Structures are given as structure tokens and as C-alpha cells.
Amino acid sequence: MPRSFLVKTHSSHRVPNYRRLETQREINGACSACGGLVVPLLPRDKEAPSVPGDLPQPWDRSSAVACISLPLLPRIEEALGASGLDALEVSEVDPRASRAAIVPLKDSLNHLNLPPLLVLPTRWSPTLGPDRHGAPEKLLGAERMPRAPGGFECFHCHKPYHTLAGLARHRQLHCHLQVGRVFTCKYCDKEYTSLGALKMHIRTHTLPCTCKICGKAFSRPWLLQGHVRTHTGEKPYACSHCSRAFADRSNLRAHLQTHSDAKKYRCRRCTKTFSRMSLLARHEESGCCPGP
């Protein structure tokens, strides 16, 4: 047999196995490019995973260090130091984030040309009074309504209000001067400037809350709850001054005015005063000053 058949020839068209070349390199040798010392990433007894889908295990600080050419560090620091950057910091990263061994370089934020941070506008409290320091002239809202001397003022009709809730209720229900879309009720001719206010008004026509005992309908669930208590006899709201109890909280508040010393309603014919408007009306209907 000719000797040429026994000699192994290397083909220039064959792709070399870089994984085998990587594992067969010298453990402690010099880099052919820069002459620096090459330190292995893993010890000799721990080989790299052979399956492409497997990820390398986390590093062991006692046995593994970053594979980096030592003479290159002074050159990198010298090149970056000329640009005004601070000293570099080498930190470990999770090897699962990337297959290759990466050494991130982190510099100081003082030398980066980053845009300034966005400053969000401050939302002022609507309870700021005109006598408090730093009170804004305008509030953050749909139209940034200015502060009136007595509180809040409507932009369109210039009607003042003491609270922001009162102004919002006025703009939704009563103010027809503001420019914008108007929502009209399909059951009556009332108009509203917000869809939410219109939906609350439509409930007065549809009456979706119905009593299962008598069939009476209500527009609000709490009105139905107070009505059901008239069937069950439940009266959870008791007066702290007497032994009376009520099924609804509003009736209790009206009753508490009878215990108050301040009588706000006065009869125009006599000097008698009453704590509630209904009591005054009953007094006038009965005839407080009968004729001779």
C-alpha cells in the first residue's frame, strides 16, 4: 500500500471544531495576540457543557475568574483615562444572561451626557386657602379654574363657590354657558355637560331598584335599603338624647335638630321658632294666630 494512503491530510474546506480547540488550549500560557497571561474560566476538572441548549453554571469565586488578558487592562484604562472618565470597575454578572463571559465596564454618571430627569408637575391640594403661603393661582384640572376670593369661581358665569365639589356640581348640572358637548335626556328636556351626570339622572326615570316585597321602585340602592327596613322593622339609627330610633340616617339627623338649642325657623306671624322647616309649615297650616 502506498505511503500516501497512511498519511492524514488536512482539507482547507473543512470547518474546524472551535470547541475542541478551546478545550485543548494551554491552561497557563501566553496569548498569541498580545502576549498576556490567559487564565481559564473553569478548572480542568469542570468542562464546558457539550449541549448547546445548556447554560453554564454560576461561577465559583474560589475556582473561577474572568478570562481576560492581564496586559490589556492598563491599555484600556490609559485609553479611557484620556477621555476624562473615572477608573473602571469590573463586576460579575450572571452567566445565564449571556453565553459568553462578559466583563461589564461601568463608568461614572457625572461624565455622561444624559438628558435631565423629567420633573412631574406638582398637584396642589384644593383645600389651600388664599392666606396660605405658596397657594397656586390655578388648580390642575380640566380647565385649571382660578381661585376666587371666597373659594372657587366658574369660568363661564363667574359664580363663586366655597368648595371645589360645589363648583363641579354646578358645572355638571346648572351651568349652560360653557362651550362643549351637551348630553340631553331622552325622557325629558334636561341637559347635562357630562355623561356621568346624565346617567345618574336617567335612573330617576328608569328606577332600576325594585322592592321584592311590595314592588315599589327607587332610583338609588340606598333608598331601596331604607324602604326595605320599613317592612322588616329594623331601625339601626338610634338617638343619643332620647329613646327614638330610625331606619334612615337622614331621619335621625332631622330628629337631632329638635334637641338643638338653636331654632333656625321662625314664624312670621308670631315669635315661635322651630328646628325644622316641616314643623314650621305644619304650624302655619294649623293657624298660629286664630282670628276673633
From Swiss-Prot:
Keyword Hydrolase: no
Location of this chain's protein in the cell: Nucleus
Domain of life: Eukaryota
Record's keyword annotation contains Nucleotide-binding: no
PANTHER family to which the protein is assigned, alphabetical: ZINC FINGER PROTEIN, ZINC FINGER PROTEIN SNAI3
Its biological purpose: Seems to inhibit myoblast differentiation. Transcriptional repressor of E-box-dependent transactivation of downstream myogenic bHLHs genes. Binds preferentially to the canonical E-box sequences 5'-CAGGTG-3' and 5'-CACCTG-3'.
Family: Belongs to the snail C2H2-type zinc-finger protein family.
Name of the featured protein: Zinc finger protein SNAI3
